[in-house]
Every structure is written in C-alpha cells, then in structure tokens.
C-alpha cells in the first residue's frame, strides 16, 4: 500500500483539505525556503485543524536547540532531516525526542545514495530520495531517474522508502505501478504559481486511491 505525503503546508484551508482527503502525512518546512513556516505559525496551523494527518517537520542541518524550539510549539509526529546530518546526529535526535527520524538522501549527485544508506541503517525509520540540486535541498520539482528505485529500495531493507522529486498526478500512477513506492512525497506537483492548489491536490489523491483500488482488485482475483 502506497502512503501519500503532501509537503510545504502553510495554510489552514490546505491542511483541512488534506484531513478531509485522508492524506497520510503533511509536511511542514522549517528550513529556509519559500515554503518555510516558523515554530509559532506551525503550532497555530496544527491547532486550527484538530485530527489533522501526522505532521512531518522538515529541517536542514538543524541544531538541537532549533528542534526543541519547534517541538515546544508544534506537535510533530516525525522529524525529517534533509541536510548533511550524520548518523550520530540522527540517533541523538531520535533518542532525545522519541520520534521517528526520516533521512533524505540526494539522488543524481556525486554521492552514492545506496551506499550512504548503510551508515544510517537501524537509526532512521525511513529514507527519502529526492533529486540532487546543488542550490536547493528538496522541493525542486525535478524528477530523478526512477530506474534507480529498485536498487534504492533493496538497500533500504526494513526501513521505509520514500520517493520525492517531480511527482504529480500525471506520473504518480507510473511510480506506483512500476516501482511500488512505499511513500510518495509531493510538494511542487500540487502547486500553481508556488501556492498549493486544491484541485491539483484532489486530482493527485484521486489518482493514488484509484491505483490502490485497481491493485487491490487485481490482487483479489489473482
């Protein structure tokens, strides 16, 4: 079963829609970005929509103090680290805050993402694979070569495998059908002019659910 995360939430109406559509995770970006929110805003946003999907906080090379500040205001369910955080730091974060840690790894740069996984095994709950961009940590809207996904999935072993980068309603079916992605992470793919677009979100969710239903029906007949 594929789970869906919509990242870069800044507005109450968007969060309320994601709750209504039963999206699996919502992402709040605390790193410098056009989608950035501060700790207080995030806390107010989550409080405004009781029963919202589990919130994932996205950070790039944070300090422990920065994480503490955010968590004192916003009830996050997952900490996603999208920078050059070491395995040791990830373990410290997991132990200190008693929350799952997701580690983002870039695909397409000089570093071998599949090789990097090994040093984080047993520490993080999931690996997120996003397209390498020297000037931006995620949210680029660029798709990496999906032919690499099977090798990345194999390297993840027991950890969840999250695919991000350039995903939208027109290609999510291919991603789910050919590669059985565990978690799909979408941000710019449901935006218009940099703002979350309700219709694009609805269309994406419909495509994901339709593909899941088709897969379930096929499995039941097999």
UniProtKB/Swiss-Prot annotation:
Pathway: Amino-acid biosynthesis; L-tryptophan biosynthesis; L-tryptophan from chorismate: step 3/5. It is an enzyme of class 5 (isomerase). InterPro entries: Aldolase_TIM (IPR013785), PRAI_dom (IPR001240), RibuloseP-bd_barrel (IPR011060), TrpF_fam (IPR044643). GO terms for biological process: L-tryptophan biosynthetic process. It catalyses: N-(5-phospho-beta-D-ribosyl)anthranilate = 1-(2-carboxyphenylamino)-1-deoxy-D-ribulose 5-phosphate. CDD domains: PRAI (cd00405). Its EC number is 5.3.1.24. SUPFAM superfamilies: Ribulose-phoshate binding barrel. Keywords: Amino-acid biosynthesis, Aromatic amino acid biosynthesis, Isomerase, Tryptophan biosynthesis. GO terms for molecular function: phosphoribosylanthranilate isomerase activity. PANTHER family: N-(5'-PHOSPHORIBOSYL)ANTHRANILATE ISOMERASE. HAMAP family: PRAI. Belongs to the TrpF family. This is N-(5'-phosphoribosyl)anthranilate isomerase. It comes from Brevibacillus brevis (strain 47 / JCM 6285 / NBRC 100599).
